[in-house]
């Protein structure tokens, strides 16, 4: 077994142990610069996830619980999110974040909404990259916290960009089964939120619509990367977050989104 340490946005870390050298090497690459090999003494006391290669998949050990998976990278991502879920100084949103004129623009959506393709398109158009899949917010300041990971794109998303004449630098990762893209321009400092877009793909229309505060709160309830306890503190935080500029963004054309971001 080899163990690596992954540093988290709250300055703590988790340990990931595995007997699979390809898995360890892919994690070291995917979580760089926040990841490194651990010495024997360093993993002691840290939240630890063990992934033992077996029968074409992995036996996952987390505390006293064990399960089998064929998706080790999702297990690592979910483990990190669960570990951070108890940190009341952070809030995790499912979406992508980019910078424009010193402010963060957040694109929030469920999986399959095209947010990865959209984020990569905007990066190729010159907007600095902040996050994709998991956006970290500081609850006290509502600042978006940078915590770099590359973009993971499916084949179909890359095909969309190729049809638009874009050819982002990418490499196919056999273990991730994704194209890995490192955007050229990256924002590495905390930024305030300029606007949050709740995005929906459409075959026929481009529209950006205002949202009432109750509508914003309802949408934000479905936006976190993990399930949070539905208590008074959490609802009060969401009410504060809902005061930001929020729009429903229905889009067919990617350049329509670019124009919305710039105006």
Language-model features: locations:
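N-terminal "assembly arms/tails" that initiate or stabilize quaternary assembly
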Residues: 29-33
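Glycine-rich, often acidic-flanked micro-motifs
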Residues: 2-27, 44-46, 96, 100-101, ...
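Short, P/G- and charge-enriched loop/turn segments at secondary-structure junctions
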Residues: 83-86, 182-184
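Conserved lysine of the Walker
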Residues: 115
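Acidic-aromatic/histidine active-site loop/patch
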Residues: 34, 38, 160
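Post-Walker A alpha-helix
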Residues: 118-119
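Pre-Walker A adenine-sensing motif
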Residues: 85-100
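Charged, amphipathic alpha-helical linker segments immediately N-terminal to NTP-binding catalytic cores
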Residues: 39-82, 254, 262-263
